[in-house]
């Protein structure tokens, strides 16, 4: 006998995951994975620091004990507060008491949503968005994603508010919150300050919570200049939210910016809502490993490493992005110009925008041993868009783009014919 939850997952969610990511889930090494957003460029640079730390014999029995403090390791919460105060320009100083640690950004978000939403409550979120958020919203918490269709030309503009307002009024559920990804995944762009302020004002007026997912905050390609002073990352914490007291929350993780997805250490920040902090701390109690918090203290969140990520790390991402951008321009492929992150959103199927054509292209990708993420998995309404990740070493990226070139050529020479038989590829 199994739970209804288990049966539902095996009937719907798990088959979809296996269909799209089966080769990766089963460890097939013959495929080139450009679907996973990892900063592998930084991983290689960080590896000697990890090895040195393990060789230095700086361990104590404390690393084998339970973590101390409400909300996770106090030292790491203090270091994250220092990072945010130095690089997110918060309107009010962030204190470690505002921070709750989790085993990665997703589990921090799980705890935050659990503190805000009852089962069945709605959360506004604009599409496209990273499908992993559905796990935190619907799978782990039984809340409901209220998908907002914002036209691309309005997505990062103040004009987007009217689309959120329309979705809120027509939602079949009680809407408790709104999630934004800033920097955005998969579009690779930052929200301008004026749009963020409009979003905070909207949430304050409607008395709903704003959750800003800022896990790519330091993964920037473009710096503000005199010609483009508004470029760059703006945190929701930097805004005057005095009229939205207790409603603004930020999720952050070390995974993306610092190239350490496997360490599993994230956090949420709530400056003016002690009830949310305490509830979240209860949900994540003893969730984070003392090994992870030790690595964060000794290696990841040192001043030297943060400076390295903010300078050299940005250059690595910019160089890889340029390779990706040149490839797409060379093949006359439409894409969303990115200014942050380690991925690009591209219309690989061109003018062929039917579901059948996207299925055909995905079959061609599988045949050529290349893994990309389809935009429809990100709730993109128009088939044919894909997210391509480029935060890997240059040789892997070159190999992946060679395979993508072959896929594009084969797709251009192939017409979809019904009935569609995936096995023929």
Curated annotation (Swiss-Prot):
Residue intervals passing through the bilayer: none
InterPro entries: Aminotransferase_I/II_large, Ethylene_sulfur-biosynth, PyrdxlP-dep_Trfase, PyrdxlP-dep_Trfase_major, PyrdxlP-dep_Trfase_small
Induction (UniProt): Expression is positively regulated by the thioclapurine cluster-specific transcription factor tcpZ.
Domain of life according to the entry: Eukaryota
Swiss-Prot/TrEMBL keywords: Aminotransferase, Pyridoxal phosphate, Transferase
N6-(pyridoxal phosphate)lysine found at: 256
Database matches in SUPFAM superfamilies: PLP-dependent transferases (SSF53383)
Keyword Transferase attached: yes
EC id: 2.6.1.-
Pathway membership: Secondary metabolite biosynthesis
Cofactor: pyridoxal 5'-phosphate
GO molecular function, one term: transaminase activity
Pfam families, alphabetized: Aminotran_1_2 (PF00155)
Name of the top EC class for this enzyme: transferase
Biological processes per GO annotation: amino acid metabolic process; biosynthetic process
PANTHER family in the record: AMINOTRANSFERASE GLII-RELATED, BIFUNCTIONAL ASPARTATE AMINOTRANSFERASE AND GLUTAMATE/ASPARTATE-PREPHENATE AMINOTRANSFERASE-RELATED
Protein family per UniProt: Belongs to the class-I pyridoxal-phosphate-dependent aminotransferase family.
Function: Probable aminotransferase; part of the gene cluster that mediates the biosynthesis of an unusual class of epipolythiodioxopiperazines (ETPs) lacking the reactive thiol group important for toxicity. Firstly, L-tyrosine is prenylated by tcpD, before undergoing condensation with L-glycine in a reaction catalyzed by the NRPS tcpP leading to the diketopiperazine (DKP) backbone. Afterwards the alpha-carbon of tyrosine is oxidized by the cytochrome P450 tcpC to form a hydroxyl group.
Protein's UniProt name: Probable aminotransferase tcpI
């Amino acid at each position: 006998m199994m739970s209804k939850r288990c049966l539902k997952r095996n009937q719907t969610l798990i088959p979809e995951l296996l269909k799209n990511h089966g080769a990766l889930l089963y460890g097939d090494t013959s495929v080139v994975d450009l679907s996973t957003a990892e900063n592998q460029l930084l991983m290689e640079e960080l590896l000697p620091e990890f090895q040195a730390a393990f060789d230095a014999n700086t361990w104590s029995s404390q690393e084998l004990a339970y973590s101390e403090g409400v909300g996770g390791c106090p030292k790491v919460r203090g270091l994250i507060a220092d990072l945010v105060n130095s690089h997110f320009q918060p309107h009010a100083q962030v204190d470690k008491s505002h921070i709750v640690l989790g085993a990665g950004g997703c589990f921090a978000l799980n705890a935050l949503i659990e503190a805000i939403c009852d089962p069945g409550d709605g959360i506004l979120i604009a599409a496209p968005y990273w499908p992993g958020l559905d796990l935190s919203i619907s799978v782990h918490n039984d809340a409901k994603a209220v998908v907002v269709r914002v036209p691309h030309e309005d997505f990062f503009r103040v004009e987007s508010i009217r689309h959120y307002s329309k979705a809120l009024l027509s939602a079949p559920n009680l809407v408790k919150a709104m999630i934004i990804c800033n920097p955005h995944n998969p579009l690779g762009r930052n929200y301008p300050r004026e749009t963020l302020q409009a979003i905070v004002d909207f949430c304050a007026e409607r008395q709903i919570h704003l959750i800003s997912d800022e896990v790519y905050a330091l993964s920037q390609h473009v710096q503000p200049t005199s010609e483009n002073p508004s470029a760059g990352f703006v945190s929701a914490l930097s805004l005057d939210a005095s009229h939205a007291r207790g409603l603004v929350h930020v999720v952050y993780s070390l995974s993306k910016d610092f190239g350490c997805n496997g360490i599993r250490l994230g956090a949420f920040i709530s400056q003016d809502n002690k009830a949310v902090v305490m509830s979240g701390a209860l949900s994540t109690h003893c969730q984070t490993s003392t090994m992870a918090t030790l690595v964060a203290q000794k290696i990841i969140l040192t001043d030297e490493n943060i400076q390295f990520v903010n300078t050299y790390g940005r250059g690595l991402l910019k160089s890889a992005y340029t390779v990706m951008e040149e490839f797409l321009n060379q093949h006359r492929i439409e894409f969303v110009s990115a200014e942050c992150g380690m991925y690009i959103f591209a219309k690989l199927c061109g003018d062929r925008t039917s579901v059948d054509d996207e299925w055909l292209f995905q079959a061609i990708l599988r045949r050529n041993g290349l893994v990309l993420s389809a935009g429809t998995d990100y709730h993109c309404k128009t088939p044919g868009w894909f997210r391509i990740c480029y935060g890997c070493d240059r040789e892997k990226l070159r190999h992946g783009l060679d395979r993508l070139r072959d896929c594009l050529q084969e797709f251009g020479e192939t017409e979809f014919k019904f009935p569609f038989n995936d096995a023929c590829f």
